[in-house]
Amino acid sequence: MINTNIIGQDAVWNRLASISRGDRVGNAYLFHGPAGVGKEGMAIQFSSLLNCQNPTDDPCLNCSSCAKFKSLQHPNIHIVVPFPRDKDINKDDPPLKALSPKTLEMLIELMKQKGCDPYIKLELPRAKTIPVSYTHLTLPTNREV
């Protein structure tokens, strides 16, 4: 949802609006600060202003682009959120420790299924695909032993 009244951020918004008016938009912006100051809201509002079809100093909130931004459904908006980290896992620990027992069991089962697969995976330089029906026609030097 676009919030046009982010409290305490008038100077920041005026700077971003002047950047938009002057067509001097950079390729990336970093919104940084303590929790609760409106970084996410300011970033979404600025993105909405840049994509607005009738921009002034604020997004018009009436065009189709602004309507999509209101519901966070615009194709140019990508919200990236980090996954929470498990505190018990250290960088020096083996990679399998990071997997839950259920995930590890599923991985073992998939590896068993792959082991029973009768087809041999061929890796040839500069070869993108080899139809399965033609694998018996390859030269013996190219077959994996």
Write out the residue ranges for each language-model feature.
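Clamp-loader machinery-focused feature within the broader ASCE/P-loop NTPase space
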Residues: 2-137
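Single conserved hydrophobic/aromatic residue that forms the stacking wall/gate
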Residues: 136, 141-145
